[in-house]
């Protein structure tokens, strides 16, 4: 529907009026042959009833419509119009092409979003503020949160039950596998081969690393740091069968003779450059796997590997 003519200053050219609603053209389009112009909404509604021009009755369809000429758009944009919110106290008169941007910020707009300053902080249309009740709103929020918490607790209980069932299934499966292995030693060899291939695949997915500050090694990481490194190992795809072993081997109490004490590490530091190390993603830590370090002496490596954590100095080899 077009704009009410009474909102405009001065006379409006008849060519700028919609023949259907008699208002000033809004989002105007024109018929291609007769060139009569209409509001887009008006002509769309008209075509829902009949496929002819409402002025000269020539055949025309929605697909035939075209934008109006630039000169008509320029004439429309220069018209001076009063604000939609004049009835609410706005006295602004502005160009038609500036109306929409003005309406977004017009302080007299009854639907302009405002924030309650009485404590609840709810954002609502300005005309709803007089009937707003903070306590009622907050009570509704609390009820919604309680419902959401109840749903989450129900979901968590279901997941816990499913996890317990899965753990029982795993234990039964492990017992079954042990029974089969005891009856067929070849199956145990096959399982070990599969596990070894999984370890190799994971190790090959890690980025090669270089340690530039061996003196920054943290040889006695606390439980929190070990938990952080363990999470990173799991996230990187480390086979679960070796995660705990690697974390056990992150502390000097489990290290081989060549790394066991600070004095020994200082004496052997020149050999550490021979380690094939892979970076634990996102951490100042490396994993030194036995399968990649067979060239190192037995006093320098452990099965399945070592985790070395540093304060700084771990770089990826690109």
From Swiss-Prot:
InterPro entries noted in UniProt: NRDP1 (IPR015036), NRDP1_C (IPR037255), Znf_RING (IPR001841), Znf_RING/FYVE/PHD (IPR013083), Znf_RING_CS (IPR017907), Znf_SIAH (IPR013010)
Pathway(s) annotated for this protein in UniProt: Protein modification; protein ubiquitination
Keyword Transferase included in the entry's annotation: yes
Residue ranges covered by zinc fingers (SIAH-type): 78-138
Zinc finger (RING-type): 18-57
Annotated Gene3D superfamilies: Zinc/RING finger domain, C3HC4 (zinc finger)
E.C. code: 2.3.2.27
GO cellular component: endoplasmic reticulum tubular network
Reaction(s) this enzyme catalyzes, per UniProt: S-ubiquitinyl-[E2 ubiquitin-conjugating enzyme]-L-cysteine + [acceptor protein]-L-lysine = [E2 ubiquitin-conjugating enzyme]-L-cysteine + N(6)-ubiquitinyl-[acceptor protein]-L-lysine
Recorded GO MF terms: ubiquitin protein ligase activity; ubiquitin-protein transferase activity; zinc ion binding
A GO biological-process term: extrinsic apoptotic signaling pathway
Keywords, comma-separated and alphabetical: Metal-binding, Transferase, Ubl conjugation pathway, Zinc, Zinc-finger
Presence of the UniProt keyword Ribonucleoprotein in the record: no
Residue ranges of the TM segments: none
Annotated Pfam families: USP8_interact, zf-C3HC4_2
Intrachain disulfide bonds: none
Function: Acts as E3 ubiquitin-protein ligase and regulates the degradation of target proteins.
Protein name: E3 ubiquitin-protein ligase NRDP1
Gene (UniProt): rnf41
